[in-house]
A protein has these predicted regions:
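Acidic, divalent-metal-coordinating active-site segment for phosphoryl/phosphodiester hydrolysis
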Residues: 148-161
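Short, glycine/acidic-enriched loop or turn micro-motifs at the edges of active sites
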Residues: 11-13, 117, 155
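Conserved beta-strand -> loop -> alpha-helix junction used to position metal-binding or nucleic-acid-contacting
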Residues: 106-120
């Protein structure tokens, strides 16, 4: 795949609507040409212990962040016409659909591809698992900031260029 937008969301709690950060990496002609990161005020606005433990974000980090529709207004023109790629895409696609619905925004029916599924299909038992950091390392990307939305989106972009 040569043209796409890799996307990753982190959530504040178990609710798919609680996106608290987003990372986007734009790939055109096989090259990373743009990236975007933003904190987002989650809805509902509370952080579960487990989610914070995973990504390190807290209520203080997003206290003055913009709400999703404001952030998406900046992202949408960047990804116009591009398929979206995520590692474990059902999660990220589910977040996107849920937050669009919650804010009563028209969902553009984005085309999603999953690098986790592609890894399972193409690499199978070559890898001990198909977690993002494992597959990224196999594809030559050193994911040192796992669960930072931008770092995860960049790792996903590296994987997609190799496997999709």
């Amino acid at each position: 795949m040569k043209n796409f937008a890799a996307i990753d969301f982190e959530t504040a709690n178990q609710q798919r609507t609680s996106v608290c950060s987003v990372g986007i990496v734009i790939v055109r002609d096989g090259e990373i040409v743009d990236s975007y990161y933003s904190l987002i005020k989650p809805e509902p606005e509370y952080y579960s212990y487990w989610n914070t433990r995973v990504h390190g974000l807290t209520m203080e980090d997003t206290m003055n962040a913009r709400v999703f529709p404001e952030v998406w207004a900046e992202i949408q023109p960047k990804i116009e016409g591009l398929p979206l790629v995520a590692h474990n895409s059902p999660f990220d696609e589910g977040c996107l659909k849920s937050v669009f619905q919650m804010y009563q925004m028209d969902y553009p029916d984005y085309e999603f591809y999953c690098t986790c599924r592609a890894s399972r299909r193409k690499l199978g038992s070559l890898l001990p698992n198909h977690q993002l950091q494992t597959v990224a390392a196999y594809c030559g990307y050193d994911l040192t900031q796992h669960h930072n939305a931008l770092a995860d989106a960049e790792a996903c972009a590296w994987i997609a260029r190799e496997l999709l």
